[in-house]
Amino acid sequence: MNETTLFDRVGGQAFFDDLVEFFYVAVEQEELIRPMYPEDLTESKKWLALFLAQYYGGPSVYQEERGHPRLRMRHAPFRITKKARDAWLRAMHFALENVA
């Protein structure tokens, strides 16, 4: 049985690239979480798109280029409160609603 991954069903890497573009449009408007990101979002966009693609069954480019995600370690410097969590979720909801 050949299972199709979510990565394949949504159209591959292009979907995740577009999703992340919309996500960061919303992040730019979230005063609480915007300071958690670098001024230039280019690298953040690249890594998030590759991470999400890999997580949902795409190629392991993220891990090959960056190693284990170590999410807890990467986010440790930030105070992620319930309000910050909700701001992140709003940004991702916006992205999901707007991605083609």
Language-model segments: which ranges?
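Core of compact, soluble alpha-helical bundle domains
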Residues: 1-100
